[in-house]
Structure formats: C-alpha cells, structure tokens
Amino acid sequence: IYNSILQKSIAKTKVHNYDIFLDNFLEGDNIPKEVYLNLINTVKEETAPLKRYIQIRKKILKLEKYHNYDGSVNLIEFDEEYEYDRAKELILESIKPLGEGYTAKMAYALSKGWVDVFETKGKRSGAYSAGVYGVHPYMLLNYNKTLDSVFTLAHELGHTLHTLYSQDNQPFSMSDYTIFVAEVASTFNERLLLDYMLETTTNSRERIALLEQEIRNVVGTFYSQVLFADYEYQAHKLVEEEKSVTAESLSNIMKDLFDKYYGETVEKDELLSVIWSRIPHFFNSPFYVYQYATCFASSALLYENAIKGKDDSKREDSLRKYIELLSSGGNDFPMNQLEKAGVDLKSKETIKAVSSQLNSLLDK
C-alpha cells in the first residue's frame, strides 16, 4: 500500500515537471523546499539535547537499558486536580504579557458560553476550536481536572484567539489561516502558561511535572515529527532513485533514523523499525507532519523575541508583529506572514531555537 503511494507521488512529480517530489506537496502554500531540507538537516545536527534527556530519564528511573516504551513512564506520581475555574485563572494570568487587548478578548471568550467543557456520555473525545465567521469560535473540550487538561485549554484558547484576531481583521475570503501557521498561537500560549506556573509554584512535585510535560511536548511535537518528516523524504527518494521498495528497505530507513537521533541511549527493539506502518499521515496526508515542527520552531523563536527579549523596544516591536501575525488570517502565503513577524525558516538559527529550549528545560 505504501509503495503505491510513493509510486503515485513520483509519477505525479514527473507528469507535472516538478524539479523534486517535495515541490508537489509544498507548492500549495508556496513553501520553498529549502525550508523542508533545512528542517530535517539541522535537527540531525541538534540531537544532543534529545540524547541528554534520555540519559537523565534512564538515571532517574534506574534502568540498565532504556526502551522507547519507557518514555511513557512518568518520572513522578502527580495527581493534583485543577478545577476548571482555577485553570481559567492560571491561563488568564499567564497571557498578560500579550497585552490588555489580548487578555480582554480571552476573558470574553471564556465568559460567553463558547466552551463545551466537561466529559459527558456519548460526547466525542479530544479537544478542538472551530471558527464561525461573523459569529465566534466554539470550543470542544473534555476537561478532567488534570494538569494536561489545563494545558489543553491553553492550547485551544490559542487557536480561538487566533481565529478571533483573524476574523476581526480580515474579510471572509481571507479569514482562514493555513495549517503551516495554525499551531504557532496554540504552542505560544502553552509556553506562557508553563513559564507562569514554573515562576509561581511552590510545589516541587508540580514543578517536576510541569517540566516533564513540556519536555515531552518538545520531543513529541518537534523531534519526533522531524524524524518522521525525514523518513518520508528518504522513502520517496527510494522510488525517485529507482531503488527497491520493500518492508525491509522502509524499516531500515526508520532504524537508521532512530540510530541517528538517539544513538546508544535507546535500545533498538525490533518493532521500532516498523513504526512507519502505523503512522496514518504517511498514508493519508504525505508531507504533513513537518508542519508541526515548523510551527513549534516558529513559536519558540517568536516567544524568545516577544516575551524573553532583554531590549524593551525590540521586545515590544516583536510583540506587535506577533499580534499582526494573528490578525493576518490568510491574507498572504504563510512564509511571508512569518517573515514579517521575524521568523526565517530557511535559517538554521530558527530551528536551533527549539534545541536551545530543550536544553534550558533540562537545566531546570
């Protein structure tokens, strides 16, 4: 099945005279192939923090050997409950650096019954923010009082505010933003919440739980997705170079990537190499997952510029550009929107902002 998908992609590349198969998938949003290649190549140079994280986990968990599935084990037990009203207060306090206007919009969104909050019988799982132009966004939650659900609320509110700013400033025809920028606002808000809770908590166990949650987020949303993006690229290269496509050759690509990313820190279990066969995006939405990583990298750089910057005037300018990004909807190609906000995804430094973030979290 996957071979037929690869063959179709390369056939379409030839029929439409694309220079490379990447152009087939990236041209819709006018994304240069250099962005994709810069992402996968730079991250392979920045795996040291990832290996450091595994070594720390291995030491704390007192394991002689570390397997991929050990990543699901929490470093500590933390079962504190966060009532919904408390979660709202935490988030509203955390986003104050974005200004009074942003804070007022979020407070309004939380007070007008736009959110279906709690789990109920027959309700679908997950969380989602859906915009309705000329009305307002609606939010689906399944809030269960866990720390994770607090961050999910912050995440979805990021989407909701992005939608509000876009719809308030753009006509209907240009109000929808692309997937390429969609996760910037959501992960930005998660970072604000993390830093606020780390600064205000007096509970050492909560502090560890916060750090562990965010580190897992960096690994899962950035490193893992770039590994998968690299896999897709190499799998397509097999067909482009007229090499044999078999389960073994596909599994060897995955094995080599895990070796590159994790080195000797993780045991190479046999099933690890066939993980490609259960990633639905590979089959249903080729060259989609890299966008999770580009959004995460963009968000990390914007956060450093707009929130952490030491120069007041530059920080204020970066914050203004960030709000303009949220307000831009689909009025331009996403690369142009991000560049106006100060993000150059063709630069290695933009990608390295995430590895620096992971190192900083590990230091804490």
What do these predicted ranges mean?
Residues 24-37, 69-80, 100, 134-147, ...:
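Glycine- and acidic
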Residues 39-47, 88, 215, 250-258, ...:
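Short amphipathic alpha-helical coiled-coil/interface segments
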Residues 17, 144-164, 186, 191, ...:
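Active-site recognition of the HExxH zinc-binding catalytic motif
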Residues 16-23, 65-67, 125-136, 156-167, ...:
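Active-site-adjacent bridging/hinge elements
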Residues 177-206, 214-216, 220, 295:
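Post-HExxH zinc-binding segment in Zn-dependent metallohydrolases
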Residues 12, 59, 63-69, 153, ...:
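C-terminal, non-catalytic "cap/extension" segments appended to globular domains
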Residues 1-138:
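Contiguous, non-catalytic segments that form substrate-binding/exosite surfaces or channel walls
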Residues 93, 97-104, 130, 159, ...:
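Conserved helix-loop functional segments at active or binding sites
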